[in-house]
Amino acid sequence: MEVTSVVMVRSEALGFLAYKKRRIFGCSGTVYTHEKRKIEAYNDSGHCTTYVGHNIQKHTAGPGQQGPFFSRGQLLVQQASDKPADESNQDIHQISFPRYEDIKAECPDAKYQYLFTLDDTAFFRVALSHADKMHILEVTGGKFINRHYMRSASPKEYVLAAITGFHLDGWYDKNHFCGRCANRLVEDDVERMLRCPVCGNMVYPRINPAVIVGVTNGDKLLLTKYNGREYKKYALVAGFNEIGESLEETVRREVMEETGLRVKNIRYYKSQPWGFTDNILAGYFCEVDGTDEIEVDMQELSMAKWVSREEIPTSLEELSLTNEMISVFRLDKGDF
């Protein structure tokens, strides 16, 4: 019985950051281009996004490449050190990945499916039997971690790309047959789409739009914590966009539902792909309108409170749009 896994591969010779002296992810808001494809770098607060190259054509995994395997919602890493990779943030841990040659030597009949490319880095998914998966685990000395571990992993330049691999793997895994006529779907040769060769039905990757909301009250920011979720650190009000609803309307509704507050002066900040939950996130800042008395929806949140700039934690992981927005407010870098 085969199970679906994903492999990310990259060229070792080019290293993690460089491609012909071009940075895949640079620093302080620099923007680079390569093959008419823009790649945004880390901005001042460390948040990174990328425009992934979706050139849908035949690609082959080959020697000199390295990367992680994904299997049933978990990631195979060759090294997951208990020692922090960043002494300023004890939650960040260094990981590395097995080489393509090692995997190929142990599983020569594995079939790879191309996902996407980031300059010298190609992402593939691969079908492995359970026995092969356990064998790979043994010979590489690796271990499996879940996708949420990636929020505290390093190096950051591949974390969001790996999470995009999770996103696509889940989409492929859930869409084998046409929902209209039940025939098997095939990959399109031109765009990122699965097509039914019988009835012509087209299936695109599922992307769920959601908002992240920074509600301000003078020099205070509304911070929350989720109820019943794995992530236990500070967050902002957040929620999914509903059918027939503008994103600004989503902002008003989610803030009211979760905290009982009314808001005004809604301002767009920026967006971020978030493959952890198959989202595209849109960040907004707004101001409390009227009373600032909070009525917490305990089904969604375990707490919500106003926090002054001086009280906001400084050691936030740098991956998420949420933490960037919290840091931007703490450093008073926006129009608040």
Regions picked out by a protein language model, each given a short descriptive name:
Residues 183-186, 204:
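Short functional micro-motifs and their immediate structural scaffolds
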Residues 272-295:
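Active-site-adjacent beta-strand/loop module that shapes the phosphate/pyrophosphate-binding cleft
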Residues 225-226, 238, 267-272, 288, ...:
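Active-site proximal loops enriched in glycine and acidic residues that flank catalytic Cys/His/Asp
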Residues 235-270, 284:
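The catalytic Nudix box helix
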Residues 1-175, 230-234, 297-336:
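Nudix hydrolase/Nudix homology domain
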Residues 75-78, 176, 190-236, 240, ...:
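N-terminal strand-loop-strand
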